[in-house]
Amino acid sequence: MHPAHLLVLLAVCVSLLGASDIPPLPLNLAQFGFMIKCANHRSRPVSHYMDYGCYCGKGGSGTPVDELDRCCQVHDECYGEAEKRFKCVPYMTLYSWKCYGTAPSCNTKTDCQRFVCNCDAKAAECFARSPYQNKNWNINTKARCK
């Protein structure tokens, strides 16, 4: 084997090893991302909603910094209600839905799926009507979310 081929093979192996450390998103979060794109045809990447304010992203505490952050707080509470009512895991719950223009519409069977889908649809619609303020992206949550 030529040395150049060995280098390419080594590079592929190293990159695959690095990629194996990146955890995949739960499928529900991927669905939620598509739902956000449906409701909100803005050009902002969905990833910008993952680290916004005190509630958009993992966890959440304190007072929401604005209307958009409040959407995330309500979404978190909705998922908490799904866990209590239906003993399901919202982040792992897949559901069926369609996009009609800018309106996500849930058409799923089980109570848990329907509830989680409605949580996501309401949040996506809330995101669409709430202004995005760059100053609230990637904030110091320890200082601002008390």
UniProtKB/Swiss-Prot annotation:
GO cellular component: extracellular region
Span of the signal peptide: 1-27
Cofactor: Ca(2+)
Chief location category: secreted
Keyword vocabulary terms for this entry: Calcium, Disulfide bond, Hydrolase, Lipid degradation, Lipid metabolism, Metal-binding, Neurotoxin, Presynaptic neurotoxin, Secreted, Signal, Toxin
Disulphide connectivity of cysteines: 38-99, 54-145, 56-72, 71-126, 78-119, 88-112, 106-117
Binding site for Ca(2+): 55, 57, 59, 76
Tissue expression: Expressed by the venom gland.
Pfam family, one: Phospholip_A2_1
Recorded family membership: Belongs to the phospholipase A2 family. Group I subfamily. D49 sub-subfamily.
Cross-referenced PANTHER family: PHOSPHOLIPASE A2, PHOSPHOLIPASE A2 FAMILY MEMBER
Protein name: Basic phospholipase A2 paradoxin-like alpha chain
